[in-house]
């Protein structure tokens, strides 16, 4: 079992490179994002290590959805249907990220994870309902 955030981050980065040929970029101006065509995940180093890990797992979830499950490959438009599709993808990416952590033996504080997911999903919910 992995016990520190640096080790967990390093293991997820290695997993993404080995399994999916995805590079992870850590910069202070990066957005937490997965760039599918470029095969890059960006992580903002201004976040705490715990937040960086959680964002990395979430963005890995996007990669798993697109690469392994062949889901959400089309860009969503601004229609209600498109917004709901993006919201579904965001929720599924959090679930896939948690499953990846579990499979890799990365301990996740369930309460902190749930709050972090909720905070991040609220922006998408607000956008989708506007």
Predicted feature locations:
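Short intrinsically disordered terminal tails
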Residues: 1, 67-70, 129-130
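Active-site scaffold of zinc-dependent metalloenzymes
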Residues: 2-6, 11-50, 63, 67
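Long, well-structured alpha-helical subdomains associated
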Residues: 3, 7-8, 48-50, 98-130
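Post-HEXXH active-site segment of zinc metalloproteases
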Residues: 33, 66-98
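Short N-terminal micro-motifs specific to bacterial/archaeal maturation
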Residues: 43-47, 84, 104
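Alpha-helical hydrophobic/aromatic positions enriched in membrane-embedded helices and signal peptides
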Residues: 50-51, 82
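Short alpha-helical catalytic segment bearing the HExxH-like zincin motif
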Residues: 51-59
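Acidic active-site catalytic centers that drive phospho-/nucleotidyl reactions
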Residues: 58-62, 90
